[in-house]
Amino acid sequence: ATGGRQNETAINTAITLAQSGADVVIIDCDLRRPRLHSHFGFSNTHGLTNYLSGEKNPDNLLKPFPELPKLQVITSGPIPPNPAELLSSNEMKNLLTFLKTNYKHVIIDSPPAISFTDAAILSTLVDGVVLVARAGKSSIHLIRRFKQRLGNIGARIYGVVLNGIKSSSVEYGYYGYSYNYYAPNDDDSTPLLEEVETVSSIHKTKG
């Protein structure tokens, strides 16, 4: 997800899981408009794109969040000319394999679904996808279309988070959209969100 409340969904999920005692890493994989570094107060001069472009030590990527020892952050790094190529690289696959071996939860803050190439690439690398929708922004038909397209390429869709609903609002037909990707450990098959057609509530994974 990118920016605003979509971005906050990934961040809040990572923080909640880390507060529960799990080892968590969150990655900014929006290589076109990165924002995660700003939220956590990190420099973005070095990050994921440096690693994917040839710097092979993943330990240099991990930025500890001082206020929450269980949480590690990987910022995007400098914006590259070839985001899709980097995300589909063997280096990206190897990095996720390394992280899944060493962390209970790996949460990827992804580009908006409108950038479908990046979203599709990431969806094939992770255990599951969560759609984060914004009330009042785009049609539910469009959300369902993206959901179907991800399903067609074999992505496991955990469910949908709907943000931005006002208690006084009666207009539920239009939503914004973006995707978050979650990669829990292989030995933990419990999804963060139950599979639903529209909206679900978040469940803490076991462990």
Question: Residue locations for each model-derived region?
Answer:
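P-loop NTP-binding module
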Residues: 1-207
